[in-house]
From Swiss-Prot:
Species of origin: Homo sapiens
Keywords, comma-separated and alphabetical: Acetylation, Coiled coil, Disease variant, Isopeptide bond, mRNA processing, mRNA splicing, Nucleus, Phosphoprotein, Retinitis pigmentosa, Ribonucleoprotein, RNA-binding, Spliceosome, Ubl conjugation
Residue positions where Phosphothreonine is found in the record: 440, 455
Taxonomy of the source species: Eukaryota, Metazoa, Chordata, Craniata, Vertebrata
Biased composition (Acidic residues): 7-37
GO terms, biological process: mRNA splicing, via spliceosome; ribonucleoprotein complex localization; spliceosomal tri-snRNP complex assembly
Nop domain boundaries: 215-333
Covalent cross-link (Glycyl lysine isopeptide (Lys-Gly) (interchain with G-Cter in SUMO2)), residues: 471, 478
Record GO terms (molecular function): identical protein binding; protein-macromolecule adaptor activity; ribonucleoprotein complex binding; RNA binding; snRNP binding; U4 snRNA binding; U4atac snRNA binding
Domain of life: Eukaryota
Site (Interaction with U4 snRNA): 247
Identification of the protein by name: U4/U6 small nuclear ribonucleoprotein Prp31
């Protein structure tokens, strides 16, 4: 049998299973429809009692009667002997705590009934007053006349002034219809039932709170009477609660929610009654999980103390709660102020010397010479001699451009060259005439020349170096002197004047 045949056989078997499953579903469909029809609420009934049946139930009446009976007795702690679960009042406390959940569901049903009936008269009131109990009280106060919104003292005790103003303005423009007397009576009956159920719920809370301090005083001090009763009911009694570890107590009351495709950001997994208690919810959200673990650990200790009927006055509970609050305060303390530290002392390492005779000598020795500076310098807009790469090597730049072609010729700057006076120029001229010319390179006069001479005839003879100059000057005074005048010569024949 090939691989393709095996795959085809598997597909045929899967198809047969689907057909068989579909037949089974078709047979069970009527039963499912019957269940759904029973769970749906028919809010179109004439009276609220057709949908809200808790108020007239036997279980509700028995629990409330037992609560009133035990409140009047005022049992003492010395009467409880043995396990707490053996006390007859313990079962009443657990049943009363469960009854509060049913009352909440009943209030939601009655609120929906009143909302559907009163939308005929004032359809906008549902969006203006979202709270269920406030809506029920407002409907009972207004009734069929919406003019009661103005200057109504009873309504001011239910709603805020801003909400009353919005309700009165909306009531003046609403397009609702007047209710008949029968419809108004049914609404009043539903409102009265809802308010009485709410009062019964508060009565149960007061009773559970007073009795939890009697059955489990230390546990109720830490997490409150209502939360203590809830976790005791889920655990199956105080004895079972005392045997549970803290990690399991923290999860009591956790519900697995199926969101069917919705966002899971608001889901809090592994959270139970302790997480939603007042002592944990008073903290910021980022500390609540940590606080729930701490409170669960202390609740375990308190439950074990209560199960042995020790510390009936709640001394251990107060100590544990003080320890919890101290840790909560420690967690919420701001971080310590960071100390301002001074900068560390700098490391005095060997510094670079930027002055001194030795440094200047080194700079002169290793620095660029004037010739190199001239060779590196180029003129803007002028073509270089080796622009076409005819010669090998680097360009000479400005070096020797304005000279005679010698590489080392000094460049003369007319603005900065040395100047001498005219008197010094005449003196140098005279010396060049006497000594046959004198320059910076060549000088005919000896360095030992003097006006004193030694001769074999006269011995010591003083010679005037300027005597020869005077002879030349006297010879030149006749024709070339600046003091010479024009001479008037009279010719013998022509009679003309000549000079």
């Amino acid at each position: 049998m090939s691989l393709a045949d095996e795959l085809l056989a598997d597909l045929e078997e899967a198809a047969e299973e689907e057909e068989g499953g579909s037949y089974g579903e078709e047979e069970e469909e009527p039963a499912i429809e019957d269940v759904q029809e029973e769970t749906q609420l028919d809010l179109s009934g004439d009276s609220v009692k057709t949908i809200a049946k808790l108020w007239d139930s036997k279980m509700f009446a028995e629990i409330m009667m037992k609560i009133e009976e035990y409140i009047s007795k005022q049992a003492k702690a010395s009467e409880v002997m043995g396990p707490v679960e053996a006390a007859p009042e313990y079962r009443v406390i657990v049943d009363a705590n469960n009854l509060t959940v049913e009352i909440e569901n009943e209030l939601n049903i009655i609120h929906k009934f009143i909302r559907d009936k009163y939308s005929k008269r004032f359809p906008e009131l549902e969006s203006l007053v979202p709270n269920a109990l406030d809506y029920i009280r407002t409907v009972k106060e207004l009734g069929n006349s919406l003019d009661k919104c103005k200057n109504n003292e009873n309504l001011q005790q239910i709603l805020t002034n801003a909400t009353i103003m919005v309700v009165s303005v909306t009531a003046s423009t609403t397009q609702g219809q007047q209710l008949s007397e029968e419809e108004l009576e049914r609404l009043e009956e539903a409102c009265d039932m809802a308010l009485e159920l709410n009062a019964s719920k508060h009565r149960i809370y007061e009773y559970v709170e007073s009795r939890m301090s009697f059955i489990a005083p230390n546990l109720s001090i830490i997490i409150g009477a209502s939360t203590a009763a809830k976790i005791m009911g889920v655990a199956g009694g105080l004895t079972n609660l005392s045997k549970m570890p803290a990690c399991n107590i923290m999860l009591l009351g956790a519900q697995r929610k199926t969101l069917s495709g919705f966002s899971s950001t608001s889901v809090l997994p592994h959270t139970g009654y302790i997480y939603h208690s007042d002592i944990v919810q008073s903290l910021p959200p980022d500390l609540r999980r940590k606080a729930a673990r701490l409170v669960a650990a202390k609740c375990t200790l308190a439950a074990r103390v209560d199960s042995f009927h020790e510390s009936t006055e709640g001394k251990v509970g107060y100590e544990l709660k003080d320890e919890i609050e101290r840790k909560f305060d420690k967690w919420q303390e701001p971080p310590p102020v960071k100390q301002v530290k001074p900068l560390p002392a700098p490391l005095d390492g060997q510094r670079k010397k930027r002055g001194g005779r030795r440094y200047r000598k080194m700079k002169e020795r290793l620095g660029l010479t004037e010739i190199r500076k001239q060779a590196n310098r180029m003129s803007f807009g002028e073509i270089e001699e080796d622009a076409y790469q005819e010669d090998l090597g680097f360009s000479l730049g400005h070096l020797g451009k304005s000279g005679s072609g010698r590489v080392r010729q000094t460049q003369v700057n007319e603005a900065t060259k040395a100047r001498i006076s005219k008197t010094l120029q005449r003196t140098l001229q005279k010396q060049s005439v006497v000594y046959g010319g004198k320059s910076t390179i060549r000088d005919r006069s000896s360095g030992t020349a003097s006006s004193v001479a030694f001769t074999p005839l006269q011995g010591l003879e003083i010679v005037n170096p300027q005597a020869a100059e005077k002879k030349v000057a006297e010879a030149n005074q006749k024709y070339f002197s600046s003091m010479a005048e024009f001479l008037k010569v009279k010719g013998e024949k022509s009679g003309l004047m000549s000079t």
